[in-house]
Regions:
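Mg2+-dependent prenyl diphosphate-binding active-site environment of isoprenoid biosynthetic enzymes
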Residues: 12, 16-150
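N-terminal amphipathic/basic leader segments beginning at the initiator methionine
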Residues: 1-15
Length: 150
């Protein structure tokens, strides 16, 4: 299954739950900035390979995409790579401002864990999912890679 409009709408809906704000707008701007959605596509393909409906993977795919996007928002900041463009469009800190970009990245990361917990799996599996996401996005995973990049 390729990522479709239904999944894109799901991503936006999860960002804008409860209310709208400048930070949520920056989160949505970054999340919907034209990525290829490779990670969700891989997850959906695996689910379909096991004969499952890809939609059961929406919460996990959304969480993974939010974590990936948070890393890009923070990577573009002046203190990191100081990139003005991301995928041919102004980086979040250029489209909004640096403080909003930091909050948007933080918001995407924390929202990812909330969304992941909406997965249709057992409590034990949810704990394993959150543990894996936090490790791979954490100091020994993605943050370690960013540290090497500085």
């Amino acid at each position: 299954m390729m990522v479709n409009k239904e999944f894109e709408d799901y991503l936006l809906m999860r960002v804008h739950e409860n209310d709208a704000s400048r930070t949520k707008d920056a989160m949505a701007y970054s999340l919907m900035n034209g990525g290829k959605r490779v990670r969700p596509t891989l997850l959906f393909s695996v689910l379909e390979g096991y004969g499952m409906d890809a939609r059961v993977g929406y919460p996990c795919a959304c969480a993974i995409e939010m974590i990936h996007t948070y890393s890009l928002v923070h990577d573009d900041l002046p203190a990191m790579d100081n990139d003005d463009l991301r995928r041919g469009k102004p980086s979040c800190h250029k489209a909004y401002d640096e403080a909003t970009a930091i909050l948007a990245g933080d918001g995407l990361l924390t929202k990812a864990f909330e969304v992941a917990l909406d997965s249709e799996c057992s409590a034990e599996q949810k704990v394993a999912l959150v543990k894996a996401l936090s490790w791979y996005a954490g100091i020994d995973g993605m943050i370690y890679g960013q540290t090497l990049d500085l």
